[in-house]
């Protein structure tokens, strides 16, 4: 037998080995993934050669990966029946790195690998990750062309040997003699866990102790017509760690602008609202069935974190690092394609089965609202998916903004909305009175954050979204101009005096007191003067500040609008002349009542004391 040949690693390879061997890694498991990925790649190449070449060594060998463990000898062996390597290929592939070897390249590599060991594979040198756990690595291989087999051997210290080896079948066997602190990689439970996490969907069988351990198929790579509902549901339960079937699933492929295969599921339950805290993203990123990024924060926007599933793209580098994922242009393109496709799917499902979509909306609508407020790029698509009750919708049945548009009056220029704790509370309040009178539909936002959502959306199909508690709402220009003239109410001059007096009396609490052209029956209401901070938005911010221990910051003063036709306001105008002091108490109580109807905070002690004064006056005169 020919003697072993000794080789020195290329200088750049030595540098890389130093990085691998002398650094501490938190993700040591990745070396198993790298070796399995290399085996899968060799098998794929062998499958191609078998189709194009007539003479192939050991042509009847099944294409598979075998893992053998020896706890006593502390070895891990990964074998494949792939394409194998010749002696020269061993030298070229395992002794030389195809890079310029500039100092900056290796400095950057060393720093990045300290943060993320996945970067090793990005440069096509994932094999060297074996030295993370092994103090000696043997590679026994024979090429598919039938040439002499060889053994490559190194301790990762700067040199390697290549020795001819007889009796080898086609393929490659890698034997890792484990370091003292890596003996767990010779135990089947550990290897099973690593395979399940990283290599469950490798397209070739992986056998451990004669048993195939990657039994779940990569359904996303198959045609939809070949897959049953039962297979989809079982796959979802596997990747989503779920017990129930999903409520929605989207399986699609795209070839342009990128090659993408994706299988996404919507769970039936929202675990964030069940007290489990913010859930981590549920979609994993794969490249050719090899896991790149588990629970990826890069492949979908954060507001789609409730989704479970897989995105696979052959266009990505097989071992791209997590740091690179954040800035990678390909990943950004994949993110846009998958996000837009899912939003399109939801829109289609909302039309196909409205009842099922409303169930989805009640469970996961909060995430779509989050998307509107945080992700301008998708606001238009998300706006079509929003659902709210309105003054003309059935009780408890939210509708789309598109449905609202269909019922709009031809001359109506805006979409109006108002927030409240419940539909009943809104309809009992003053803000909808004129809308009812004019038969104008108004959107009911029943969630405290809904005003934030619609203020961020700003418009829908060219129609501006406007909060009905704004000071500049005008539903009828003629009424607005004639607001101070009404024979059934306080006359023009007297009402003007009352407004001036109330503005002075309430100057510490409100920015202005105005005659309302919107109120029909109610005596007064609070309106938002700045056109942005609605009452509900102010409540949300106040609650957030309190939760964070931040001192309260007063917003802009609200305006008080009064209804000169209301009996209480007419009597207040008379009372002001007879008893200005007591009239002041009544004016403050009217303001507090309006504030409470708007959902704003008042001083309860002052309000109760004032209430008793007014009650005492009323009872004493009864």
UniProtKB/Swiss-Prot annotation:
Presence of the UniProt keyword Chaperone in the record: yes
Cellular component, GO annotation: cytoplasm
Complex formation: Homodimer.
Annotated region described as C, given as residue ranges: 540-622
Job description of the protein: Molecular chaperone. Has ATPase activity.
InterPro entries in the record: HATPase_C_sf, HSP90_C, Hsp90_fam, Hsp90_N, Ribosomal_Su5_D2-typ_SF
Stated family: Belongs to the heat shock protein 90 family.
Keywords: ATP-binding, Chaperone, Cytoplasm, Nucleotide-binding, Stress response
Region (B) location: 323-539
Protein name per UniProt: Chaperone protein HtpG
Signal peptide annotation: none
Subcellular location as annotated: Cytoplasm
Region (A): 1-322
GO molecular function: ATP binding; ATP hydrolysis activity; ATP-dependent protein folding chaperone; unfolded protein binding
């Amino acid at each position: 037998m020919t003697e072993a040949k000794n080789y020195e690693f290329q200088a750049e390879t030595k540098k890389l080995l130093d990085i691998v061997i002398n650094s501490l890694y938190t993700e040591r498991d990745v070396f198993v993934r790298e070796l399995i990925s290399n085996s899968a790649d060799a098998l794929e190449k062998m499958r191609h050669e078998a189709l194009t070449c007539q003479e192939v060594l050991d042509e009847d060998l099944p294409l598979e990966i075998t893992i053998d463990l020896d706890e006593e000898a502390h070895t891990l062996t990964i074998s494949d029946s792939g394409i194998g390597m010749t002696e020269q290929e061993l030298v070229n592939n395992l002794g030389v790195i195809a890079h310029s070897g500039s100092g900056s390249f290796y400095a950057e590599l060393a720093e990045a690998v300290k943060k993320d060991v996945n970067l090793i594979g990005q440069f096509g040198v994932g094999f060297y990750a074996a030295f993370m756990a092994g103090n000696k690595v043997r590679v026994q291989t024979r090429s598919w062309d039938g040439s002499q087999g060889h053994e490559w051997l190194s301790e990762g210290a700067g040199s390697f040997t290549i020795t001819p080896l007889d009796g080898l079948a086609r393929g490659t066997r890698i034997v890792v003699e484990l370091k003292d602190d890596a003996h767990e990689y010779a135990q089947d439970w550990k290897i099973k866990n690593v395979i399940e996490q990283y290599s469950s969907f490798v397209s070739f069988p992986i056998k451990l102790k004669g048993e195939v351990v990657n039994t779940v198929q990569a359904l996303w790579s198959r045609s939809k017509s070949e897959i049953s509902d039962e297979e989809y549901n079982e796959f979802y339960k596997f990747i989503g760690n779920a017990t129930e079937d999903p409520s929605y699933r989207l399986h699609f492929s795209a070839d342009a602008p990128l090659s993408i295969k994706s299988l996404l599921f919507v769970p039936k339950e929202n675990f964030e609202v069940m007290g489990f805290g913010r859930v981590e993203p549920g979609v994993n990123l794969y490249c050719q069935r090899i896991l790149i990024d588990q629970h990826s924060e890069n492949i979908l926007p954060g507001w789609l974190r409730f989704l479970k599933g897989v995105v696979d793209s052959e266009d990505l580098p097989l071992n791209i690092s997590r740091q690179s994922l954040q800035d990678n242009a390909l990943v950004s393109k994949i993110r846009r394609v998958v996000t837009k496709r899912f939003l399109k799917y939801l829109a289609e499902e909302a039309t196909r089965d409205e009842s099922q979509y409303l169930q989805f909306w009640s469970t996961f609508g909060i995430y779509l609202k989050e998307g509107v407020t945080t992700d301008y790029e998708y606001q238009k698509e998300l706006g079509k998916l929003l659902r709210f009750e309105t003054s003309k919708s059935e009780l408890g049945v939210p509708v789309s903004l598109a449905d609202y548009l269909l019922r709009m009056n031809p001359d109506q220029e805006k979409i109006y909305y108002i927030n409240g704790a419940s539909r009943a509370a809104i309809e009992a309040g003053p803000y909808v009175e004129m809308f009812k009178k004019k038969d104008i539909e108004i959107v009911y936002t029943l969630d405290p954050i809904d005003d934030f959502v619609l203020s961020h959306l700003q418009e829908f199909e060219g129609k501006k979204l406007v909060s009905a508690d704004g000071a500049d709402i005008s539903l009828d220009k003629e009424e607005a101009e004639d607001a101070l003239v009404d024979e059934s109410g306080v006359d023009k001059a007297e009402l003007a005096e009352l407004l001036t007096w109330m503005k002075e009396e309430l100057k510490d609490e409100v920015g202005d007191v105005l005659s309302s052209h919107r109120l029909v029956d109610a005596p007064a209401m609070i309106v938002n003067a700045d056109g942005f901070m609605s009452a509900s938005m102010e409540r949300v911010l106040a609650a957030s500040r309190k939760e964070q221990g931040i001192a309260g910051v007063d917003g802009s003063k609200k305006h008080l609008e009064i209804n000169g036709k209301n009996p209480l306001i007419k009597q207040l105008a008379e009372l002001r002349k007879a008893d200005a002091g007591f009239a002041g108490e009544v004016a403050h109580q009217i303001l507090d009542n309006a504030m409470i109807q708007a959902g704003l905070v008042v001083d309860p002690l002052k309000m109760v004391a004032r209430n008793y004064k007014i009650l005492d006056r009323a009872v004493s005169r009864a």
